[in-house]
Amino acid sequence: MKRFALAVVTLVVCAGAQAASEEVEMNLVTSQGVGQSIGTVKITETDKGLEFAPDLKALPPGEHGFHVHAKGSCQPAMKEGKPSAAEAAGGHLDPHNSGKHEGPEGMGHLGDLPVLVVNND
């Protein structure tokens, strides 16, 4: 999976009980802070769980990690003595404290979502 130092997309879901859907703005982030908007992700409650519908622009073609993080901040924070992009978002959402990070294809914690694939067009 390709990694992008200048563009890390993180997602935090804070949906109210009465809300059937929520639209969340997505921004590019760097170790200096939150940057330009690149679109939205619409999150809808369905009978099978949450559905994530990204409407994003300006991402390079290829695979991108797609995650739900534990905290509602995409600000930089210190990691190993250096500013790190979106570190304030915390780890991936793991409300059951499974401690399992098995990636998008595994049966890990709830914060791991399928890989987001961006086509050339």
Specify the residue positions occupied by each region the protein language model found.
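N-terminal leader/targeting pre-sequences
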Residues: 4, 9, 18-121
